[in-house]
Amino acid sequence: MSSWGDSLKISVFGESHGKGIGVVIDGLPAGVRLDMEGIYLQMSRRAPGKDKTATPRLEKDIPQVLSGLLDNTTTGAPLCAVIENTNTRSGDYGNIMSCPRPGHADYTGNIRYGGFNDISGGGHFSGRLTAPIVFAGSVCRQILAEKGIRIAAHIASIGNVNDIRFDPVDIPSELIDRLNVSTFALIDQSAEEKMRAEVEQCRMNLDSIGGTVECAVTGLPAGVGSPMFYGIEGVISSIVFGIPAVKGIEFGAGFDAAKMKGSQDNDEFYYDGDTVRTRTNNHGGILGGISSGMPVIFRAALKPTPSIGKQQNTVDLVKHQDAKLEIHGRHDPCIVPRAVPVIESAAAVAVANLMMQVNKL
């Protein structure tokens, strides 16, 4: 299924080398005026071909809205947007039609769909399909901003090079403003040179590298979410895992909480005026699947781009024998910088859906 959500539902369609890709967003409130330039800005942060850390495939990624918008204002009808694919080179994939690429969905997709799936550029499994997610998320984050809810993410790490983490109890609006327009989003900008060097070394060695993205949601009121299976962690995780390359996620202190004592992990409450807050935020803004009013913080791990220039071992599904494979085409040596606005957008869609569930949006 390429559809997600209940109160707010998105359906992503298209393939990497097809005529276009897009998304249908169903359940948006009517009468919301959208800043299209703001949406184009977020699309450009994800768009390929603009940085050495990214694929040289150049796409403008300008969404064409087909329905649900009149004079830049939502009508209440499903909002449908299409993004044209203008720079495809399917010939680069001729040698992989019968030889699945290690780390890709070529083999599993072949088995699942009986060999009828389009593998050019990764087909429907491609990271290109994150562009519609960014469009949907850009719409949602504008609606959330009217409620005082803001979302920002940054590159937490590339390889062994780390950025500093968000202050879990106090994320300044000035930092959110800066990260929201950055194409190489870092809290400590001095880490950029080392991160770029790490990526460049992999690129020169015909290899790739992964990393992590940290995301924060501020302004989410207490009381949003549900227990057990529809808690905030589950809702956010379910859409974040729809992003190709994401292999793990943690909230708050995450796996570090497993090393703590209860007296260390527990976040003590106090009154800040009339507002209940916690002095620490190991719980990442979520208790029992429900928001506490503190910033919601999570980190997602992204594996290295599987398409690399090194010769690799695979199999030939037609000849039923082992084979060697050299991958051609244009690929990201590191997907992490471009994944930042995608993670933000996935969080925005998830939070909008959660807010609608409790009639707060």
Task: Write out the residue ranges for each language-model feature.
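Glycine-rich, N-terminal phosphate-binding loop and its surrounding beta-alpha-beta segment
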Residues: 42-108
